[in-house]
Amino acid sequence: MMMFAVTAFSQQIYNIRVSSMEDGAFENMYGTIKIYGDVLNGKKDGAWVENHPNTDLPRFIINYKEDKKNGLFLEFDKQANLIKKIDYKNDMIDGCSYSWNKGGKIASKQEYKEGMLDGASVIYNDKGFMQEESGYKAGKRHGVTTWYLYDDRTQGPKYVMYNYNEGMFEGIQETYYEDGRVKTSKMFTNNVANGPAFEYYEDGSVKSECTYKNGEVKGKVKEYRKGERL
């Protein structure tokens, strides 16, 4: 086993160069931080670990194959709580990525493909309540994205829902009152407002309506009294 004592602050695992090192177990002290793993054919191989300063508690556990991140990436806080769990393939995030807030509450849950967001993405606030739910394709919003209300104790309803096509607004875009009724509604094509747009009162009756063409209002904006029938 190779051991070294180096006076330095913190050294991330991925900055360590092992190309000139012999095969076998590697262990190195960077000041008060211990980093260790295996070397095979001059490359990182298997699980590499970086501890928290002055402890034997892991901060990072990163799996390698031929010097590239492959498999699970794990990050822990000083109390040994898991705060990140990420799947890697060929040095890129590929699969699921999770993160947690202090106390173990979920902070994010996202799907990746070849290093880019691709699939479902859910973001939570520091209380563990959902604040954003999205779909992605090749790193761009794709499909429905919904934002939610919340307070310190309870999960609230959705208040915004947008439809995307490869990062651009496409289709109906809506906002909502706290009781779930539609507040505004507008149609988009290729990121430009096109078609009918409505604003509603809390009771669901139409407050105003108009029509957009290429991002501009065409014709008159019609306004209505609360409860008035069209």
Segments from the language model and where they lie:
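Periodic aromatic/glycine/histidine/acidic cluster detector
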Residues: 10-125, 129-201, 205-230
